[in-house]
Amino acid sequence: MAKGIMTYDVGEQVDLHLLIKSSTKGIASNGKPFLTLILQDQSGDIEAKLWDAKQNDEQTYAAQTIVKVVGDIHHYRGRNQLKLRNIRPVAENEQIRIDDFLETAPIPKHDMMDTIMQYIFDMKNPNIQRVTRHLLKKYGQEFADYPAATKNHHEFVSGLAYHVVSMLHLAKSIVDLYPSLDRDLLYSGIILHDLGKVKELSGPVSTTYTVEGNLIGHISIMVTEIAKAAEELGIDSEEILILQHLVLSHHGKGEWGSPKPPMVKEAEILHYIDNLDAKMNMMDRALEHVKPGEYTERIFALENRSFYKPTFHE
């Protein structure tokens, strides 16, 4: 099996196929155009610059294009970067599939969906259970395949479902410790809090924001979806309002994207669980690529900090 791009050390030469995750045009200080390419395989992704880009390069090296690259790994501003020596699109006769380059959740998606459905079946509140089942059935296929984000955390195939499963397991332990929490409400809030991302994001490959995602966002999308589900199911109860509040407030603060701060216990706990699982995923994935005694690349979403892997973890 070919060595993954994230396993290369600084100074090593790279000669392998990669998938262009994103391609952004820029203008250098000398006035010449260049492309910033994010190149990925199943081990992760890395940035590369294509300098002095020609007029047709923007189309040739667009997102979702598989390329053969030769270059060297450099360290730049706290992160590894691929310095390109040569790059070309793959030929049709090379028979390489996009799926070969996609990072996926470590648990099969069918197993994750079975786990989530079991949490729904265990709910005792019929109104909460019906709305949750209705929405998961409506968007189940996309939910099982989509990433949880375009970057930072769980940004891989089935990352959304993996994020939710981890959060549900955390919630179960927390509710066992603090039984005054409404188990059904918290479970439902976890399952639905990011479900709007199936409309906010374009899909599991070269993920970008849709027009609806840019203009409305996953929080507002899901608040509307909960209201529509309740109307279709003939449910008119306070549970719907509180469930909408959990979705609205799960980012915690206005400056983090929530129109309202958490104002019920379960909303506060949902915010903490979401934040904890996202940060653990960021740290774990960064630490996978360093040896004991080394520091990770800087993690932008964690105040641009680097994390150290202790030597006694060898």
UniProtKB/Swiss-Prot annotation:
Pfam families, per database record: HD (PF01966)
Identify the keywords attached in UniProt to this record, alphabetized.
Answer: Exonuclease, Hydrolase, Nuclease
Q: Superkingdom, according to UniProt?
A: Bacteria
Record flagged with keyword Signal: no
Matches recorded under InterPro entries: 3'-5'_exoribonuclease_YhaM, HD/PDEase_dom, HD_domain, NA-bd_OB-fold, YhaM_exoribonuc/phosphodiest
Q: Where is the HD domain?
A: 163-279
Q: What is its EC number?
A: 3.1.-.-
The broad enzyme category this protein falls into is: hydrolase
SUPFAM superfamilies referenced in this protein's UniProt entry, alphabetically: HD-domain/PDEase-like
Q: A biological process (GO) annotation for this entry?
A: rRNA 3'-end processing
Q: Please give the Gene Ontology molecular function terms for this protein.
A: 3'-5'-RNA exonuclease activity
Gene3D superfamilies, sorted? Hypothetical protein af1432 (1.10.3210.10), Nucleic acid-binding proteins (2.40.50.140)
Functional summary from the UniProt entry: Shows a 3'-5' exoribonuclease activity.
Similarity comment:
Belongs to the YhaM family.
Which NCBIfam families did the record assign?
PRK13480.1
Q: What protein name is recorded for this chain?
A: 3'-5' exoribonuclease YhaM
Taxonomic lineage of the native organism? Bacteria, Bacillati, Bacillota, Bacilli, Bacillales
